[in-house]
Amino acid sequence: MRFEQPLEEGRLLRRYKRFLADIESAGGERLTIHCPNTGSMLNCMSEGCRVWFSRSNDPKRKLPGTWELSETPQGRLACVNTARANRLVEEALLAGDIAELAGFTALRREVAYGVENSRADFRLEYPTGALFIEVKSVTLGFDETAVAAFPDAVTLRGAKHLRELAALAREGIRAVQLYCVNLSGVEAVRPADEIDPAYGKALREAAQAGVEVLAYGAEVTTEGLNLARRLPVRL
């Protein structure tokens, strides 16, 4: 996935009201841009950190740009635009780059399922039946180690999705929790038990119920993203 247009570099002044960020561009222009991330963005929003943003050509849009990338304190690039994760996964699915999920005959997005009114990010159809996928974007890395963690904030919704997937797996339906790691320099993924122990517990229970837990790491550059390789998940 290449960015639709060249990204511009700047530095972060502040993030506020969840969806807004003030930045200063490399040319000294101060802008308020859209922050497309509902998480805490731990390690992705230290004051003064380097950021990259895309500009909008839509004159009707209130904000002139969207925050796309951050440089973490460890010098890694993180894609903070969580909407990119689903697009990146779909691109990889259609290209056959996720070997464990290859061979499907149809793909649908945002499909309702479960008893808790959830929507799966993807439903794949195979000759043998359906498969449901929940995608999570991972950008959290605590230190110099090459292990990323999820979530970066307490997520009741994420735990609900795991319960729904586990229920499918118990019925004999393939269910997948897929972590799209949009952080460079990562070699493995784990649940962030120190942030949300309930989520970690739900993930382990889902895996025991038969949910397939997969993680794929992206090559993150200022030109684009590429879902490059499978990563181990340390439960």
Curated annotation (Swiss-Prot):
Classification via InterPro entries: SfsA, SfsA_C, SfsA_N
Gene Ontology MF: a single term: DNA binding
Family per similarity comment: Belongs to the SfsA family.
Alphabetical list of HAMAP family matching this protein: SfsA (MF_00095)
The protein, known as: Sugar fermentation stimulation protein homolog
Source organism of this protein record: Pseudomonas aeruginosa (strain ATCC 15692 / DSM 22644 / CIP 104116 / JCM 14847 / LMG 12228 / 1C / PRS 101 / PAO1)
Lineage of source species: Bacteria, Pseudomonadati, Pseudomonadota, Gammaproteobacteria, Pseudomonadales
